[in-house]
Amino acid sequence: VTVNTLVKQDELSSVREALDAICRAGADAVIVQDLGVAAMVRRDFPSLALHASTQMALCNASGADFARRFGFSRVVLARECSLDDIRAAVQTGVEIEVFAHGALCSAVSGRCLMSSMAGGRSGNRGRCAQPCRQAFRLDDRRGALLSLRDLCLWDDLPALCGAGVRSLKIEGRLKSAEYVAVVASAYRRALDAIAAGTFRPGDSAMREELLQIFNRGGFTRGHVMGAQDAALCAMERVGHEGVALGKVLRVKGGFAAVRLERALADGDSLQIRGSQDLDMRYSGHSVEAGGTATLRLRPDMRVCEGDSVARLSDALQLERARAHAPKPISVSMRARFEAGAPMRLFISDGQSVAEASGPSVERAQTRQATPEDARRQLEKLGDTPFLLARPEDLSIDMQDGLFLPVSALNALRRQAVERLAEARISAFAARAGETPARGPEFAGPLADGSDVPSGSPIGAQTLAVVFSDAALADGLKARGANLLIYEPRFFTPEALEADLASLPGGIWLRLPPQLTERALGDALAVVARHEKTLGGLLLESAGQLALPLTLPVIAGEGVPITNREGLRALTRTRALGFTLWPEWTKSEQRAIMPFELPCLLTMYGRQTLMLLNHCPKRAVDGLSGGRGGCGLCTNGRMACG
């Protein structure tokens, strides 16, 4: 069950109640982003396994190891991980889950404040308004410049399996049941074929199935398989692209003749794309690919010769998908009505039995009820998961001359159905087995405090300044800044080495929130060479909290601390301070006082709204490789507006 939102202090009691209900319902695990919620689960609900949400932005082996030590049994890695990063994370021993199909966030996982700052709807609270699907301008180009294609790793499943991935995640939020059926079935069949040694990548029919159910400008293989920039983006259309069906040959008398590239069936949903997009549903005989179909146009539709036609939904595909819908559960019912005794109804699914009782049955003063009257009310199971497959599955034992109110019969039926559902759930919970073995409690380097610096650099008069021009360091210090935090513009080993060599002593270094395992290793090697002159490190990912460091560290905004549970969890790490979460109001920040660690509050400067792992400028220019020698970001104005 997903519980992967950041939680305010005054919401903790409600979250605890929700976790209790989740636990009692027999759930196996919860997916969590908030460190405070994770700590609460470990302490109060040890039977629930902890899965780290992709919103935690864990992107390398160090991040996976942090999660393992905290007590997470599975990590849903950030979508920006490469296959090499995935392999390295698997080696930590924690189960690894990766996104394999569906919508992608434009921003780095868990590092988007755009929706929150632009419209008050936080993506970290499950309320993203998807501003990245809106139109932006860059130079002379306007369009959905931040919108990404949907991910599809169907062909790459053997590589993921070979890397040791334990679970695949399909992004299906707000999608139809048919979408879930088609995509889940495709990946299930592929995994079974891989296990049997019969999988064949490049299956055009399977790709057609996936494209038809939903795609944005086709698919991307994502960061996992090295897609860059233009290979990630879908700038022309943010909704369903559909599949190309054909082109309009001629228009006459309210009809359009279309030459078909694909077969067309009655009930297919189409979109004619010319000067505007026009939606319609085809009604008529099926037409094979290569044939000509006649479309009846509405009076308001302006269609021209040469307009393209896309099929948005395939009626036959949807019909096949609906066959995957859960089948109703066959039940039997037995009712007993006796004057002066309570109404009674028994219902059974063959394993569980439930009983409902109603008011005492009275003698009829006028019209008496018949067994058929009772049957009509008791067999109404249409909006429930249950089914009376045969008439004889409902037996009624009743005396003559009784009065049976319709409302009482309906209430009796509803009560019986609810109790059977509860009995089935209880049986599931009982079968859930023993409490899962708890992982090791997170201890972190504080288990032995001998190498942990004492005292925090943050005090009542601390003025911290983050800067990216090494030449400014002395001037900032002269003007009263007493905590200087350097944020390199380029985080290559060579650039970082040169920057740190030119900085005065005592400067702190801000680590990027997203570093591949290799880049992280290179950076830490440079940091180690300058350890005696650096003041400390500002960490921008929860996964960095467990790095093997001896320098002092402060948790930045990339380690969201939004409640006192999270703050207490942070005190068990090396952090000597933290940064207040920028989405919270003053009253929400005060709610976690008194702070158990010194804190920083951002007072001035441009708030980073989105951290991107691709370049919109390169995407606009159609570039999808060769980043090594690119200098676009150092030339001119590169901001989208």
For each feature predicted by the language model, list its residue ranges.
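Active-site pocket-lining/capping segments in soluble small-molecule metabolic enzymes
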Residues: V1-L58, V76, E80-S167, L174-G641
